């Protein structure tokens, strides 16, 4: 995806996705979409897609995991929580994370993605919702400006709880060794990565 925001139609059958197609919007993408966007769906049905909730002791269920997370956060001190969200999340998800961040005075940020623009359909910003992340206060005009501070906070022991949505933070300055210093790592994602493997609580995410 990218920041253009092409209007699309999803072709699916029996809970399996088969295609993206452009939906006409003359103000954004007319009748077109790029080939990369059209074909960017196969990961949704990957065999290794995350499907089961995991807690510190292994497999668990949603009610138990959410209660344990809630109980932990209820005891968290202000400034001891940080959130790394994704600029690929919806406005609604980002808004709720921003409310959680305000409750704990948490440091928050997102991960930037960029590529070459074609000045027609493909934007340089390869995140579809950087604007939403900025408007909700999750990140600033310079996306990733606070990731370094989050890493330093974990290293110093000030940040004890990290919440990660849809990103592999080990690729962005918060490595596995730092993650090991946390009291609790809460991760929601769709596909496995180095961050999901380190999670104390793993909550499978939704693609659409």
Give the residues covered by each predicted segment.
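Catalytic alpha/large subunits of respiratory electron-transfer oxidoreductases
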Residues: 1-208
């Amino acid at each position: 995806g990218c920041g253009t925001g092409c209007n699309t139609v999803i072709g699916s059958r029996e809970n399996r996705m088969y295609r993206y197609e452009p939906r006409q919007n003359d103000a954004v993408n007319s009748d077109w979409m790029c080939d990369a966007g059209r074909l960017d769906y196969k990961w949704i049905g990957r065999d290794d897609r995350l499907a089961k909730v995991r807690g510190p002791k292994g497999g668990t269920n949603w009610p138990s995991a959410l209660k344990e997370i809630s109980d932990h956060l209820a005891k968290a001190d202000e400034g001891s929580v940080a959130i790394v969200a994704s600029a690929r999340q919806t406005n609604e998800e980002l808004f709720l994370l921003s409310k959680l961040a305000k409750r704990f005075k948490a440091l928050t940020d997102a991960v930037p993605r960029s590529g070459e623009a074609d000045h027609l359909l493909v934007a340089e910003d390869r995140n579809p919702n950087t604007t939403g992340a900025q408007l909700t206060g999750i990140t600033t005009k310079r996306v990733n400006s606070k990731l370094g501070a989050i890493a330093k906070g974990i290293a110093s022991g000030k940040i004890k709880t990290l919440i990660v949505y849809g990103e592999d933070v080990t690729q962005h300055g918060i490595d596995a060794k730092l993650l090991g210093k946390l009291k609790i790592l809460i991760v929601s994602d769709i596909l496995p990565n180095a961050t999901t493997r380190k999670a104390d609580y793993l909550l499978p995410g939704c693609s659409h």
